[in-house]
Design a protein with these regions (language model features):
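Conserved functional hotspots at enzyme active or ligand-binding sites that engage polyanionic ligands
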Residues: 1-115
Length: 115
């Protein structure tokens, strides 16, 4: 159930469908990367999907592992598959808060992609 606007570092479960081509699909955990002020003002969230696979992202270094992070969510954060979602239009469930070190690593990976 969706309640309120999520914050940076929240791990949510939601459906990423519809998708096209190589975009990651289905219902899965995502990590919220956008700043709280942006989230609240727009109702939009920049999220990175979390998966157990992600071979290409692992090989290219565009992911952050949750292994050893102390989260109940397992897998890797796909920083090369970020997308904007409308938090007011999608149904989601809050799972947990990611450690700040994981969020910082994910933001660094996104910056590397954009620079």
């Amino acid at each position: 159930m969706s309640r309120g606007i999520p914050a940076r570092g929240d791990i949510l479960e939601l459906s990423l469908d519809p998708t096209h081509g190589r975009e990651i699909r289905g219902s899965r955990p995502v990590l919220v990367l956008s700043a709280d002020a942006f989230n609240k003002a727009s109702g939009l969230l920049l999220v990175a999907p979390i998966t157990q696979g992600g071979t290409a992202s692992r090989e290219n270094g565009f992911c952050v592992t949750l292994l050893g992070a102390g989260t109940k969510t397992h897998g890797i954060v796909l920083c090369d598959q970020t997308r904007t979602i409308d938090a007011r239009a999608r149904t989601f469930r809050r799972i947990e808060k990611a450690p700040s070190t994981i969020v910082d690593e994910a933001l660094d990976a996104v910056r590397a992609i954009l620079s």
